[in-house]
């Protein structure tokens, strides 16, 4: 299952998982046509796929989504908890609704989806023909789990919280052979941040923060997710893989600060 999978990074991850041979549930909250298009692309690789509409911040909808998945797909092996959004504002102007919406989707959504997945992982246990692990969870975080971001306090708080959520969950579940990791994308060309890259001036400014000198593409993250979910990464647990062109290297200090 990939949540928030009808656009951007989620879409790329869902397609890459299908290309790698996985059956895929494409979760989305709005945009039926886009979700169905992703499903058709995935089916083109000869695997099963279906689009499930659910708000990941809603406990009842998440429970119903997983119940449907168990009925139609039998089980779950990999959860990519990708759904996320921004509601930006200066701190003194930020409303409680903006705060709650971001925390609800970006952090509570991780909790609700992971809880359902872990219940199934523990019920089923390891299937050696499928994986060395009983289950894999990938939390889609951000470089802003460690980089402060003024004007985006709710978003950065959700990602910082996600880091400790992921690590605590990984610690708790490791004895059950369940792996939990995060991916922290940096500047990536997606609909959520169009204003940061859609003009030359904006792009040039953004590149001052990226030592590698190019914007990331959703496929950069998708390929990382496929690897992290595979048995090639079986000994990796409780870690964040930053896919960021070096944004977390504090580029302002490259010339002595």
Label each PLM-derived region with a short phrase.
Residues 32-33, 53-65, 96, 219-220:
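The beta1-alpha1 cofactor-binding region of Rossmann-like NAD(H)/NADP(H)-dependent oxidoreductases
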Residues 114, 158, 166:
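Active-site helix of classical SDR
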Residues 90-91, 98-103, 206:
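Substrate-binding pocket helix/loop in short-chain dehydrogenase/reductase
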Residues 174, 179, 236-238:
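Short, small/polar-rich loop/turn modules that mediate ligand/substrate recognition or access, typified
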Residues 147, 226, 237-257:
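Short C-terminal tail/terminal secondary-structure segment
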Residues 6-7:
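Conserved glycine-rich cofactor-binding loop
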Residues 142:
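Residue(s) in the substrate-gating loop at a strand-loop-helix junction
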């Amino acid at each position: 299952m990939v949540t928030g999978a009808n656009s951007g990074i989620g879409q790329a991850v869902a397609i890459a998982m299908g290309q790698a041979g996985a059956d895929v549930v494409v979760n989305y909250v709005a945009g039926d046509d886009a979700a169905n298009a992703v499903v058709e692309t995935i089916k083109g690789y000869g695997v099963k796929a279906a689009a499930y509409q659910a708000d990941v911040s809603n406990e009842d909808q998440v429970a119903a989504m997983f119940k449907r998945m168990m009925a139609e797909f039998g089980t779950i092996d990999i959860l990519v908890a990708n759904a996320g959004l921004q509601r930006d504002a200066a701190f003194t102007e930020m409303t409680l609704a903006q705060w709650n919406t971001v925390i609800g989707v970006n952090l509570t959504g991780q909790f609700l989806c992971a809880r359902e997945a872990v219940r199934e992982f523990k019920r089923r246990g390891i299937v050696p023909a499928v994986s060395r692990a009983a289950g894999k969870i990938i939390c889609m975080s951000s470089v802003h789990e460690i980089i402060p971001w003024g004007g985006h306090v709710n978003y950065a708080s959700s990602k910082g919280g996600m880091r400790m959520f992921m690590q605590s969950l990984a610690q708790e579940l490791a004895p059950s052979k369940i792996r939990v990791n995060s991916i922290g994308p940096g500047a990536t060309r997606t609909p959520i941040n169009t204003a940061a890259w859609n003009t030359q001036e904006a792009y040039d400014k953004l590149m001052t923060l990226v030592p590698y000198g190019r914007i990331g593409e959703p496929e950069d993250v998708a390929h990382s997710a496929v690897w992290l979910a595979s048995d090639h990464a079986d000994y990796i647990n409780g870690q964040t893989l930053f896919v960021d062109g070096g944004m977390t290297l504090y580029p302002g200090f490259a010339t002595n600060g």
